[in-house]
Regions:
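Transmembrane beta-barrel wall of Gram-negative outer-membrane proteins
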Residues: 25, 248-279, 290-327, 335-358, ...
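Periplasmic N-terminal accessory/gating domains of Gram-negative outer-membrane beta-barrel systems
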Residues: 88-91, 110, 119-215, 232
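Outer membrane beta-barrel strand-and-loop segments of large Gram-negative receptors
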Residues: 385-389, 428-436, 523, 527, ...
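Periplasm-facing N-terminal accessory domains of Gram-negative outer-membrane beta-barrel systems
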Residues: 20-110, 114
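Surface-exposed extracellular loop regions of Gram-negative outer-membrane beta-barrel proteins
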Residues: 368, 413, 458, 478-533, ...
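N-terminal periplasmic accessory domains that precede
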Residues: 95-100, 148-151, 166-168, 195-201, ...
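C-terminal beta-signal and adjacent terminal beta-strands/loops
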Residues: 658-690, 703-711, 715-767
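Gram-negative outer-membrane beta-barrel transporters
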Residues: 442, 554-556, 575-664
Length: 767
């Protein structure tokens, strides 16, 4: 009997093995017919079966363990006709099949279910916004030019500190805690000094994933958020481009094939080039003179170029480079400029007989900044370095295995004088090595997405294990519960204090060695900044046109490094009896952020509406006292509307209204004469003219007035010859001219406001 059972078990195992062996795999890429660009997030399936997949950002799809036979593979996505191909799958073989989708030329008569809504059922998708150029352009085009940073300001949990020199604070994290990737390359400062524009040209973007909390182990080195930006490959069919000009800026975009495909078995090469230039510092002297007697002293220039070589199988390699410049020149007050440049390559490799997709990148980037003020010593900061990585993605029907390795090396060089006139210098070289593993498993209605990252920081000899987890449960076809969390660490810190309200100077430095040995009575064992995230949420598709998303989150920043504003002594043996809080250049703090974000979206034919409400609480703890950081905004509301008119949908009206409760502010308590003993005891204080010092009140215990602003734009498209159109845009920033307080000059008691009403006009020609 026992022998029979053994034979029976062996036979069953053999049968299962043979059954698995008698299956096939189909994989490939989906492309757009009009320009040869990959089509991301399209639904691909075998007609009449349950086998289905979604294309990734490269247009890649894969389906495995398919019984041999004849099938029709189909691809669908919003705005395109369904593409299909008949295939015959053979056991133990792999079919590579390319699909080409044609754009619809007729007005939508009914609402189509987008692939984005379908992917919500198979991906955790918590605390992440996928942003497309079409969505960016549905907002008012401020300065007659839509921009990613304008869209970022309406993303749930994101707070902008101002129109001039403003930065983005994402669910309690500071800008240095937000990792920005452009085609896999690290960008250290993605936003220009005037807070309406980023360094990215909207027309070259393919997709931007904004992770606001709880992101997976494929991302490391930051403790708050990630912006992963992917650009287009360039038109593979014909030479085309766009030329635009307005009252704020002008730009030129050119793209086209370097080598066209002779047939479907031939490879291609293409390019895309964007040049963007702002002349607001010149036009504002006449058009916006009411905003400032000297005009608005902001100017910038951005250049980005990319060359892509594609094989017939879908494998590709890309080479890219950029140069970004930004300048601010307040006459007789301050001069500020920064520059960023870099280049690199990335590739996607699809081995013919393998189910694995291999991706890799290698890039170098540099960022330097300098601020010269009339009454202060100059400050400067430099960070440059490389990053490289390889990751492997393995598809098992709806399951995925993703693993990889990343190496980053960078140098920081920093010079700064704090409020106590103490000089702070640091020059460091550091290397970070990270490996990660991620496995996504779908079990009926449950999606499990665990991952782990192991990160080594060579300059401080610290090792950081970072487990993370994402979960989703499909309660029904239209209601889903989700959660995510994990541990995070980073080395890079900002070269300015979290307490600074207005600071154009935004530099970087790596984790310093001279941290205090204790915090809040406990010994400090690590030099890294550390955080823990937890996010829970619910998605509800009310109907085909209307859905709601609610997320609650916690970020526990259990160790932060900040510049010490109270540093008045050198950390030498002569000052051994002084506490670390007055002699260390840097201090340790803790932070805690919690909040709830509610998003309602409505999309039906010509109308798009979006309501975002954010409730947030952020605190910092120095060990001696607790305070609210300057970006702590209790309530933030954004209402967005977009409507298309005309038979050809050639008119569009866009509007956005933003309300924010007041930011924390520290008030003055008085003034005193400050004597600078430059020569020590030999200083003749009777001949030394003192400087005016400020006695500050309790840190950030008061609040600025509430902020609100309405922006509107109107667009008209004139269809010219084939593939050519002229678009005219009129926009108004701050329609009702609300005087929103930016900051108060402590010495002169002058109130400096955000941008006033600013109408603009622009036109663009696409060809």
């Amino acid at each position: 009997m026992t022998i029979k059972r053994i034979f029976l078990a062996a036979f069953c195992m053999l049968a299962v093995s043979l059954a698995n062996a008698q299956t096939a795999t189909i994989k490939g890429f989906v492309y757009a017919a009009e320009n040869g660009e990959p089509v991301p997030f399209a639904s691909v399936f075998l007609k009449g079966t349950t086998f289905a997949s979604f294309t990734d950002i490269n247009g890649y799809y894969s389906m495995v363990k398919i019984p041999p036979g004849k099938y029709r593979v189909m691809a669908t996505t919003l705005g395109y006709d369904t593409a299909f191909a008949d295939v015959e799958l053979v056991a133990d073989e792999m079919e590579n099949r390319k699909l080409v989708m044609k754009k619809k030329n007729v007005e939508l008569k009914q609402v189509e279910v987008s692939a984005e809504r379908q992917t919500k059922k198979t991906e955790v998708k918590i605390a992440v916004e996928s942003v497309t150029p079409q969505e960016i352009k549905s907002l008012p085009s401020l300065g007659a030019e839509g921009d990613l940073v304008q869209y970022m300001q309406v993303v749930p949990g994101v707070v902008s500190s101002g129109d001039q020199g403003g930065q983005l604070y994402i669910r309690g994290g500071t800008p240095v805690q937000n990792k920005v990737l452009l085609d896999g390359m690290v960008i250290y400062n993605p936003f220009h000094s005037i807070g309406l524009f980023s360094v990215f040209d909207t027309d070259i973007l393919k997709n931007t994933d904004v992770y606001t909390a709880g992101f997976g182990a494929q991302y490391g080195g930051r403790i708050s958020s990630v912006m992963d930006i992917t650009t287009r490959d360039g038109n593979k069919k014909r030479i085309g481009g766009k030329v635009s000009a307005g009252t704020f800026l002008s730009k030129v975009l050119l793209e086209g094939p370097i080598k066209k495909a002779k047939d479907e078995n031939d490879g291609t090469a293409s390019f895309i080039l964007s040049v963007k230039n702002s002349y607001l510092d010149q036009t504002s002297k006449s058009i916006y003179k009411y905003a400032s007697d000297d005009g608005l002293p902001y100017s910038f220039n951005d250049i980005y170029g990319k060359v892509v070589i594609n094989s017939a199988s879908g494998s590709k390699v890309s080479f890219f480079g950029f140069n970004f410049l930004d300048k601010v020149n307040y006459s007789k007050v301050a001069k500020y400029d920064w520059s960023s440049s870099g280049g690199g390559m990335n590739f996607v490799l699809v081995p013919g007989a393998s189910k694995v997709l291999l991706r890799g990148n290698l890039a170098f980037s540099s960022y330097k900044i300098k601020l010269t003020e009339a009454e202060e010593k100059p400050r400067s900061s430099l960070v440059n370095g490389f990053n490289m990585g390889f990751n492997w993605l393995y598809f098992l029907n709806n399951d995925e295995i993703n693993y990889g390795i990343e190496v980053q090396g960078f140098k920081t060089d920093f010079e700064y004088f704090n409020y106590a006139k103490r000089q702070i210098n640091q020059t460091e070289n550091t290397t970070e090595i990270g490996i990660f593993f991620r496995y996504k498993k779908i079990i009926n209605k449950l999606i499990i997405d665990p991952s782990v990252r192991l990160q080594y920081y060579a300059s401080i000899s610290e090792f950081s294990p970072e487990p993370r987890l994402g979960l989703k449960y499909n309660l029904s076809d239209n209601i889903r519960l989700k959660a995510a969390g994990g541990l995070y660490a980073q080395n890079l810190i900002a070269a300015n204090s979290d307490r600074d309200v207005v600071n154009f100077f935004y530099g970087f430095l790596s984790a310093p060695d001279d941290l205090p040995s204790e915090f809040d009575g406990k010994s400090v064992k690590k030099k890294l900044q550390l955080a823990r995230h937890a996010v829970v949420g619910v998605e509800y598709d009310i109907n085909k046109y209307f859905d709601i998303n609610i997320e609650g989150y916690i970020k526990d920043f259990n160790q932060l490094t900040n510049i010490n504003l109270d540093n008045v002594y050198y950390d030498t043996a002569n000052n051994f009896d002084n506490p670390d809080s007055v002699k260390k250049s840097f201090i340790i703090e803790k932070g805690f952020t919690q909040g709830v974000d509610v998003v309602l979206k409505y999309e039906y034919r010509r109308m798009y509406a979006w309501l975002v409400y954010s409730l947030g609480f952020s605190t910092r703890n120095t060990g001696n006292y607790e305070y609210a950081p300057h970006f702590d905004r209790r309530h933030n509301i954004n209402i967005i509307g977009s409507y298309k008119l005309g038979k050809k949908l050639d008119w569009e009206v866009d509007a956005r209204w933003n309300f924010g409760s007041g930011f924390p502010v520290t008030l003055n308590q008085g003034f005193y004469p400050y004597l600078n003993f430059q020569d020590g005891l030999a200083t003749d204080y009777t001949q030394n003219n003192g400087e005016m010092g400020v006695l500050y009140g309790p840190l950030n215990e008061s609040r600025l007035p509430t902020y609100h602003r309405l922006d509107i734009s109107i667009k008209k498209i004139f269809y010219l010859v084939r593939n050519s159109e002229l678009e005219v845009v009129a926009s108004v920033v701050n329609v009702y001219n609300r005087k929103n307080v930016f900051y108060v000059d402590r010495i002169r008691h002058n109130v400096v406001n955000q941008l006033p009403i600013m109408p603009s006009l622009g036109a663009s020609l696409t060809f």
